[in-house]
Design a protein with these regions (language model features):
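Eukaryotic intrinsically disordered, low-complexity regulatory linkers and tails enriched in Ser/Thr/Pro
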Residues: 1-13, 17-62
Length: 62
């Protein structure tokens, strides 16, 4: 799970395994394999870095 910030400043945890795509339009829109979408304050690169960090934690066993 990664934490992101919605446009209303609410923080939410999302399942990074369900992310299908991330695009900037100019807001960052995360699309999920479930068909849902969420608009967040983080940039596309920030989301990428969060997912990479999360995956490293899981696979290293921290």
């Amino acid at each position: 799970m990664i934490e992101v910030t919605k446009l209303n400043d609410k923080k939410v945890l999302i399942n990074s395994d369900l992310i299908e795509s991330v695009e900037e339009t100019p807001d960052t829109v995360i699309s999920f394999t479930t068909g849902k979408k969420i608009i967040v304050k983080e940039s596309r690169q920030d989301i990428k870095n969060l997912v990479i960090s999360y995956k490293k934690e899981i696979f290293v066993g921290i």
